[in-house]
Amino acid sequence: MASSNLIKQLQERGLVAQVTDEDALAERLAQGPIALYCGFDPTADSLHLGHLVPLLCLKRFQQAGHKPVALVGGATGLIGDPSFKAAERKLNTEETVQEWVAKIRKQVAPFLDFDCGENSAIAANNYDWFGSMNVLTFLRDIGKHFSVNQMINKEAVKQRLNRDDQGISFTEFSYNLLQGYDFACLNKLHGVALQIGGSDQWGNITSGIDLTRRLHQNQVFGLTVPLITKADGTKFGKTEGGAVWLDPKKTSPYKFYQFWINTADADVYRFLKFFTFMDIEEINALEEEDKNSGKAPRAQYVLAEQVTRLVHGEEGLVAAKRITECLFSGSLSALSEADFEQLAQDGVPMVEMEKGADLMQALVDAELQPSRGQARKTIASNAVTINGEKQSDPEYIFNDEDRLFGRYTLLRRGKKNYCLICWK
């Protein structure tokens, strides 16, 4: 992405929700590289899909020659951002937040280049400047620059104040000051001139712009990316099992890949613009090709491949595709023990069973059939496979050969109903 028209290119991809003083920012970018930052609060032990768009935006700016700062909120994570939240967040312990900070720093690292010369990325933690700050310094040097009148009129806070059942604590109310000071501090330390974040962060970003001007007399800018929505109105980044995480131990690469494969046609080309680095022309050509092919669209596979590779690397993508192909074909010989571990984690329904169980009981315990009688009929009708092999004997009892890697047996009823038995 050429730096001179970077904002326009982001707008073409639908990646700009709001921007402060767009002309002045475009002019500043045209003058040469800038430093910019995005903050990630450790509210869990992993980032999730909602963090991916701003994180990839940092990467887009770095590819255009700018210097990204990834700020992990070791201090702000102890407080909790009230922006557009219906209720007060539960406060986490300092030890927990520090553990999460370390995990999130590791997660952010592969997306950015920390060794590429002048625009090498920087990892920062706002606990470094807040951890030793006393309350008098905070109130005198930061608090005096904030108007409570303006703070309570910010949309992100106003929604909470207008709820009869929920107020807002002074702790969360102060969050706006902390994030504002982050911007001013990073401006002084690293010359940061731009903050990016989700559109729910607009109020916090503008506070930081104002504080930086007051403290350092510098003009800085803010840009927000849209909160991703799906065409059908349902929430993006959620499955029946909850959030889709970037940590492979919380959402397996297979499950992650399947999430993107299941993207609706109405969303897929937009998501290619948000979550991949494909050229707009390439995405438009793919859309045209899918429209005229008369076959199932290819876009979902392109999207799943690109994003899984970005997040889980080539190895994660290869494993996800291998598991997908084996489940589709019914031949499990190519699956490794690690592949079965992914399936057991979240890939297919899983049940633990004692050795010596019979097939009818397994179908009932696996909730593939409601009763032994129904299970008997299904088995006899040749509709059940064990590890890809059909089994039509209702009295069948599992043996050691059925236990792949000594632990796993994959049952299938019909074409798509799977359950993985993990033997105790």
UniProtKB/Swiss-Prot annotation:
Reaction equations catalysed: tRNA(Tyr) + L-tyrosine + ATP = L-tyrosyl-tRNA(Tyr) + AMP + diphosphate + H(+)
Keyword hit for Secreted: no
Top-level taxonomic group: Bacteria
Primary site of residence: cytoplasm
Motif segment ('KMSKS' region): 235-239
Residues involved in L-tyrosine binding: Y37, Y175, Q179
UniProt key word Thylakoid: no
Residues that hold ATP according to the record: K238
Sequence ranges assigned to domain S4 RNA-binding in this UniProt record: 357-414
Assembly behavior: Homodimer.
Family assignment from sequence similarity: Belongs to the class-I aminoacyl-tRNA synthetase family. TyrS type 1 subfamily.
Protein name: Tyrosine--tRNA ligase
Organism: Salmonella typhimurium (strain LT2 / SGSC1412 / ATCC 700720)
Gene responsible for this protein: tyrS
